[in-house]
Every structure is written in C-alpha cells, then in structure tokens.
C-alpha cells in the first residue's frame, strides 16, 4: 500500500534531519543499500569456502578459539599476511607479549609494516584498539588474546585478591563501544580466545571461553580450531592437521568445517589445501596413489603432489583460480581489501558449500 503524500513529506523531513544530525547513512531504506559482504582471505582455501563469503567478513567482530597449540595465532597471522598482500594495513595487539616476528615472517607477514602493540593492561589494549578502529585506516586488528586482557585493578592489586567478573565487565563495555565503530570503519576485528573448563558440569560440554558472554553475542563469526593429528615424515613430526568448525556465522550458513595442514616453521600449507579441495571439487583427480590435473601427473602420494605444486607456483596459482571459480557463489563473492575500498560487493553465497553442514 502506497504511503500518503503527507506521511511521505513528514518522513522525508525526519530523514533529512537525521542525516544532518548524525551523518549521511545513519538511516536508509534497505533498497538504498546494496547487501554486500566484503571479505579478507584466511590463507586457507578450504576455510574460505567453509565461511561462505571467501574469507572473514569486514566490518565485523570475529572470535577464534581453541585449545593450546591448535593454530589460533597461526591462522590470524595468515589473515594478516593476506591483508598486506592486497594492500591493506594490519595491527596486532599482543596482550600475551609472545609475538614471534620470525615465525610471523615465515607465515608471509611483512613484519616491517605490521603495527604491533604490547599493552600493560586490558583497558590500555582495548583503548588502543578503539583508536585504531575509529581511525578508519586499519583493515584488520588482531587481539591476542582475550584471556590476557587483565584489568588494571587486578594488576595493581595483590596476589590472591578476588576480582570476580572484572574481565567480563571490561569486555562487555568495550564491545558495546567498538561494535558500531567496527561496522562503520569496515575493520575486521579478530579476538583470539582460550578455553577453560567449567567446574562441576556432569552433562554437556564443560568447555567455555574466557571473558564472559559478551563476545559470543557480538561476534558475527566464531571459529573453533582444533588439532586433529600430527603430520609425520618418517619419525619426525613436521606439522599438524587442523580442523576448523564455523560455530557461528551471521553472513553465511554456519556449522561447516574445513581441514588443512599447519607445517611447523611455515604455517598453513597452501599446496596441501589445493590438493585436498581440488580433489573434493573434482578439479584434481586421484587414481590409486597418483594425483592428476587432467592427464598430467602431479605426484605419487599427497606429500609428493604438494611438493610438485610448491616447485611449480604458477601451476598452483592456476589450480587455485579454478577452485575459486568453481566454488559455490564464486561469481558473487567478492574479496576486497584496503582502507579506501568501496563499500560494495556482491551478496554472500547462501547455497550449499562443498563441505557438509552438520
């Protein structure tokens, strides 16, 4: 039913006043705004496809959690590296004071251009984070980790003092302030989190994340990363197989899973991703122990096929392009990086991915 001329005139006056008072774009019709999801690649093709939009969404809060040594920091460093490759700016807030520039460089991070902060308190870390977000010049901010955001009162107090709920209140207040700014600045704000065990749980999952419940609600994407098995070459352990479950996803269907190799001192194995996803999507063919691209042999055994692609990066690039082009929603999912990137990309894929939904 059409709106009456009087109501239309009153509505136009109200919208004009809101735009003058709060800035253009403070309110708009849904038809005026292109539904778009800008994404930053994760460094893992399998995870990009599982996320449904080609990577982690910009302008959103993301939580990555898991047990110790499961690959949380490695994954974020690959996201930082992908951001830098595409001309973006990244910041790493190292609340744990454990940042390793050598390993970050091995993961592809340009450490000379990376902004790194090692704050003394949780309040300082989140204030730095807010300043960076509001600048509009940062594409990705990683906070490592929520568990290390110690409130000032706890640091200044004595050992054994009780500070119940301080960290949860700190996170709740910070996320209330940050969520709107993150959306407007198109910054991807990534929180790494640790697991704790709930005491006395008889039924259900006893695991929980630190920092209260606020982050669970504000996060648009939550990724649960776990080590599945060790990768061995002979008797030597050379890496670990990681499985990531998309526990929450507001931009695409959730509960998809992705697996990839994390090689020690190298990070995520791009070639392993290409082999695995290529076979799943039938771009590569496996016959017995041999892997083929068309009629061309890549190698006997997965490790040999990975090594062949590592020795032939141009071929690996070509296969990756074929995978992304053949993935569900490929013509619509658009990857955009750069603080000055236009706020427009095609809609997120809402179809079924190659990874089974649970």
Curated annotation (Swiss-Prot):
It holds the Pfam family RecA_C. It comes from the Bacteria. Its main location: cytoplasm. InterPro entries: AAA+_ATPase (IPR003593), DNA_recomb/repair_RecA (IPR013765), DNA_recomb/repair_RecA_CS (IPR020584), P-loop_NTPase (IPR027417), RecA-like_C (IPR049261), RecA-like_N (IPR049428), RecA_ATP-bd (IPR020588), RecA_C_sf (IPR023400). It is found in: Cytoplasm. GO terms for molecular function: ATP binding; ATP hydrolysis activity; ATP-dependent DNA damage sensor activity; damaged DNA binding; single-stranded DNA binding. Keywords: ATP-binding, Cytoplasm, DNA damage, DNA recombination, DNA repair, DNA-binding, Nucleotide-binding, SOS response. GO terms for biological process: DNA recombination; DNA repair; SOS response. GO terms for cellular component: cytosol. The keyword Magnesium does not apply. SMART domains: AAA. Gene3D superfamilies: P-loop containing nucleotide triphosphate hydrolases. Signal peptide: none annotated. ATP binds at residues 66-73. Can catalyze the hydrolysis of ATP in the presence of single-stranded DNA, the ATP-dependent uptake of single-stranded DNA by duplex DNA, and the ATP-dependent hybridization of homologous single-stranded DNAs. It interacts with LexA causing its activation and leading to its autocatalytic cleavage. Belongs to the RecA family. This is Protein RecA. It comes from Herpetosiphon aurantiacus (strain ATCC 23779 / DSM 785 / 114-95).
